[in-house]
């Protein structure tokens, strides 16, 4: 056959859903589109599962299907770093290159008459929610869970068993260790596909994925040192610092004397601070202009990088 031609095509979302999630304990399958309903019944027939045919039903309610069953809120929770628990506690999920860390906080949890009982109940709730979030986010690899400290060993074993029971319906292979003396539980989950974060998020262009940026004062001082380094080089005529507006304000006001001192020490070197309203911290650009190079006389005519 002449190239190019199709070698393989992944099944559509209906086929994949039935293939991956069809289980005997499913009570009904609701579909809000008649055409999709017919395709689903055809696929069930092709699978030789007539027992599921009667479970496939057309949803005709006026409220959208996902809103009626509060699925939208569950989907949104999969995109949140913090997930609330029924008792008022929460779990915080952070993924790194090496592992996924999950921290349980009692926060406003008030159930129970003492701290130990509150910790135990919150950890039980967290075990159920963690199992659900692992499936929703399709998190794989090494996962470390920091449970709230519990003194009785029986409580630790109960939380471990609750987690094992909660992940039974997960189609990925899962291994779970015991809670250590530091309150940490390590587990691994088979990576079936890219996680929700990998497939639907991109790295923040401002912080480059770190989650934090340097404050204005710290960054300004760093840029000031870099300006001085460039000014010290031989044959330097000018040093241009193209920076965000807050950084320019700090350098031109709080550090005006320091900029003037650099120009005084390096006789003949001109330091030019150019505010760029399109630039955000921590981004900046310091440019050294050698003697003899042509540059615009006016700073506002400098290119905005």
Segments the model singles out, each with a brief description of its role:
Residues 1-305:
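DE-rich acidic low-complexity regions and acidic surface loops
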């Amino acid at each position: 056959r002449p190239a190019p031609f199709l070698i393989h095509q992944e099944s559509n979302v209906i086929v994949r859903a039935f293939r991956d999630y069809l289980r005997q304990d499913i009570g009904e399958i609701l579909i809000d589109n008649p055409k999709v309903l017919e395709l689903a019944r055809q696929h069930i027939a092709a699978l030789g599962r007539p027992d599921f045919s009667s479970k496939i039903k057309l949803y005709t309610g006026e409220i959208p299907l996902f809103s009626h069953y509060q699925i939208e809120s569950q989907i949104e929770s999969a995109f949140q770093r913090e997930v609330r628990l029924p008792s008022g506690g929460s779990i915080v999920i952070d993924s790194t290159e090496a592992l996924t860390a999950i921290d349980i906080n009692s926060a406003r949890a008030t159930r129970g008459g003492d701290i130990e009982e509150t910790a135990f109940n919150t950890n039980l709730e967290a075990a159920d929610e963690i199992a659900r979030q692992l499936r929703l986010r399709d998190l794989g690899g090494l996962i470390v869970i920091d449970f709230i400290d519990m003194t009785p060993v029986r409580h630790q074993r109960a939380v471990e068993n609750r987690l094992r029971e909660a992940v039974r319906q997960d189609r990925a292979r899962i291994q779970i260790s015991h809670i250590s003396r530091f309150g940490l539980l390590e587990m691994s989950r088979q990576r079936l596909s890219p996680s929700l974060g990998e497939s639907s998020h991109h790295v923040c262009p401002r912080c480059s994925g770190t989650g934090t940026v340097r404050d204005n004062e710290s960054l300004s001082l760093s840029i000031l040192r870099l300006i001085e380094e460039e000014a010290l080089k031989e044959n330097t005529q000018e040093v241009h610092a193209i920076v965000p507006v807050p950084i320019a304000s700090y350098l031109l006001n709080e550090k005006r004397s320091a900029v003037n001192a650099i120009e005084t020490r390096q006789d003949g070197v001109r330091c030019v601070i150019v505010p760029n309203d399109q630039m955000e911290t921590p981004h900046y650009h310091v440019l050294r202009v050698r003697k003899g190079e042509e540059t615009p006389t006016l700073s506002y005519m400098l290119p905005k990088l």
